[in-house]
């Protein structure tokens, strides 16, 4: 499947300081892109964590079914845990840590990641990382992949995705405006929401065709681009953006 340029690419709702002039759009001028920020689990790494099983273990079967029915776009387990008592939180985080450790033990780099990073390096485009996983997982990812993403923020950075603050922090660190950055991830409710709220371009990685128009309509979140493989992103960037340093 080739990349999808969404209708919102032309009518992006950005903060005033991040707006794109209609004059540029009508003359087909390409917008400058200076940085790409990636999600980690399911984007840079092959998805291996059984999130449904983890949610059941943390919430209990009845609560899991109820919350899932109330949240068709997905369960934000970290958000639910925040309101619990300290003892209950600790037990929940221990369960999550166990599942995440299993994921770390099975960590595999997503096909196309090395090639995409090489392309970004050749264009001097910065790359960062935002994950709701822990910093230890980021460190192991860096060790195994031997390519560094910087800044690389785990859930220790508060507030975490889908809040835009992690992405805005990276933009500030780079001294780059959000509308010169793209957020790439496999989660509509976390990655695309984070990017949209920050005023960045967004690209949804959807390998299995999980997301469709109904999901975008219900969530109110439409990515600017959608790809089924990281290998499609290089062509997407070259076609739609000015990549000159």
Curated annotation (Swiss-Prot):
GO terms for cellular component: chloroplast; cytosol; endoplasmic reticulum. Keywords: Acetylation, Hydrolase, Magnesium, Metal-binding. Pfam families: Hydrolase. It is an enzyme of class 3 (hydrolase). Belongs to the HAD-like hydrolase superfamily. DOG/GPP family. Gene3D superfamilies: 1.10.260.80, HAD superfamily/HAD-like. Its EC number is 3.1.3.-. It comes from Arabidopsis thaliana (Mouse-ear cress). GO terms for molecular function: hydrolase activity; metal ion binding. Mg(2+) binds at residues 39, 41, 186. The active site is at residues 39, 41. It comes from the Eukaryota. This is Haloacid dehalogenase-like hydrolase domain-containing protein At2g33255. Its cofactor is Mg(2+).
């Amino acid at each position: 499947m080739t990349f999808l340029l969404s209708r919102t690419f032309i009518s992006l709702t950005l903060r005033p300081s991040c707006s794109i002039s209609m004059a540029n759009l009508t003359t087909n001028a390409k917008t400058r892109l200076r940085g790409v920020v990636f999600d980690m689990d399911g984007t840079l790494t092959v998805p291996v964590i059984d999130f449904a099983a983890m949610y059941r273990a943390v919430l209990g079967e009845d609560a899991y079914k109820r919350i899932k029915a109330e949240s068709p776009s997905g369960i934000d387990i970290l958000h639910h845990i925040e309101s619990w008592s300290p003892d209950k939180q600790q037990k929940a985080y221990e369960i999550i840590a166990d599942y995440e450790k299993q994921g770390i033990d099975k960590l595999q780099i997503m096909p196309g990641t090395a090639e995409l990073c090489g392309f970004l390096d050749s264009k001097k485009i910065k790359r960062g990382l935002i994950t709701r996983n822990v910093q230890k997982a980021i460190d192991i990812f860096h060790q195994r992949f031997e390519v560094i993403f910087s800044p690389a923020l785990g859930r220790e950075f508060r507030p975490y995705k889908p809040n835009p603050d992690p992405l805005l922090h990276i933009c500030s660190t780079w001294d780059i405006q959000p509308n010169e950055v793209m957020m790439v991830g496999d989660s509509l409710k976390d990655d695309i929401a984070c990017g949209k709220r920050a005023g960045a371009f967004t690209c949804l990685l959807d390998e299995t065709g999980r997301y469709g128009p109904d999901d975008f309509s219900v969530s109110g979140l439409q990515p600017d681009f959608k790809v089924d493989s990281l290998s499609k992103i290089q062509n997407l960037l070259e076609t739609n953006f000015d990549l000159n340093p």
